[in-house]
Amino acid sequence: MIFRAATADPADVDRALAYPADGPVAALTAEKVREELAGNRLRPEWTWFAEDADGEVLARALWWGRADSERPIALDCLQVRASVADPAAVAAGLLAAGHAAFGNLPDYNVSLPRGWRDEPELAAAVAWRQEAAYKAGLTREIERLRYEWTPAAGTTGPTGRLVFRDGTDEEFLDAFVRLSAGSLDLHTQTELRSMDAEQLAREDVAFYLDCPGERSWWRLAHLPDGTLAGMAIPSATPYHRNVGYLGVVPEQRGQGLIDEILGEITRFHASQGAERITATTDSVNAPMAAAFDRAGYQVTEIRLVLEAPSTR
């Protein structure tokens, strides 16, 4: 078996486009691959094949990044021909080859419909992908709900329970530190096992500054008496406006203030003409999921995230 990037021959990109987007797990179509290549979010060096001795392509892996990314951020598409007897082994070898070339282990995002475990063919296709990812070092698994808001859902007006204002970098850093305490977010919980809250806060600030959204959108949320209640960080992806980050400080939780903060983010994006606002939360984060439901956001897919454990 030969594992290689689509860089050896000008025809390699055409081969990537020609690979059928079939199978029970959703795959990128030729049109979508072409669009992402044009936007520099997919690249030949991030597109990998597994070939047999005769040069037949048996598997395809497409890693994705932002247009200015130096290395890929996530694996978006992994396919193995139905004729392959052990798809997990071939896929694991393909992922390992890509990881070695990139010098890192990007997450693998698998987009799935709700109730996917109840569909035997789909569940089996997910299972070999999980096995391959695990063998390639992506041993941590998180299931997330992907939400979407459209103008048909409408917005709610401010109630006056919170006052939103801009803040300094240090104020936002402090808010990130405070919000991490008792967080139900699995990523936050995991990272806090290997670093302190301030280090994680600095990484979170850097992450959102690097997103396509604007720093000027960020808001601190205060009670009318000036007490910090939480934070709203509207953001964006290369495709749509995004909820970004929001939260309530521990001492103010349980009073419905998350609805006020989510409402502020939604109103902001809607006022800018957003036709779609996306968001994700862990499936086990019931309070956040309930807030999205109350705000009219709809679950559009389940996102199974397979990632490498923290090495710190």
Predicted regions and their residues:
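Active-site rim helix/loop that mediates acceptor-substrate recognition in acyltransferases
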Residues: 20-49, 190-223
